[in-house]
Amino acid sequence: MLVLALDSSATASVALARIDSDAPGASAEILASYESEDTRSHAEVMAPYAAQVLADTGLDGAAVDAVLTGTGPGPFTGLRAGIMTARTLGFAWNKPVYGLMSLTAIVERAFADGAFRDSRTAANSGMNRAAVETLVASDARRREIYCALFAVTENGYSLAAGPSVGPAHQTHAPAYDPSDPAAPALGYGAGLYTEALTASGWDVLKDYAHLHPTAADLVKAAARCGVKNLSRDTQALYLRESDAKVPAAMLARTASAQPPHGQQNTGEQQKTRGQQPAPASPAREQ
């Protein structure tokens, strides 16, 4: 089956992949992919990237079997761009649209590379326990991280907790026997706050401390999980309210400037009679 994947939780990326089965444990062959390192141009590039991966493979939307979108967590504007593009394409092509948490892409990359077998964390302790509890983090700005905890075994991984947002120094590693090595931490957010996470008991894997979620890794994670097991819920995981809100002080000044109830509007006020104020941006996409 052909799956078009999009993720805009950090950078903007699109990938077209052929998955050999919709059952768990499948593999994905990336046919074409594009990624922008610019974390602020998502709205401008997502649709063109989708068109380009199809053009590169000589296909069109009719050939696509499903659309996959990363659901975050991520900043409001960027994350919304990818999700809305995925929904629009799914609607236009009459194809199912699936959602998968974006941080899954990072743990997929590390797992596929054998990081948990080769790192000192896994070699010394990870596969001797039922699972290695692994932190995956991305940059939430404001000196915070978006993060989730995954349980990693020899056979795969699963979400153990999260996602959540908060300061890195408040993200404490699970308490293991003192003889155990520290639990691993991955992702760009881990690289930004290596010192704070190390002090909190994590072992930041340097080879994976630069990673952002990508559409290519996301679709590989979807194949491993099984497309038939994916959720059709594409609700965005913003985790905190949008910055694009009118300040409370400005709202108060606006309210105090309104004419008393029952007073007749004149001039410019008459032109706007009946218009409703724009609603504030929601904290979560419906």
Segments and roles (model prediction):
Residues 1-73, 284-285:
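N-terminal beta-alpha supersecondary unit
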Residues 68-97, 102:
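DPxDG-like acidic metal-binding loop motif
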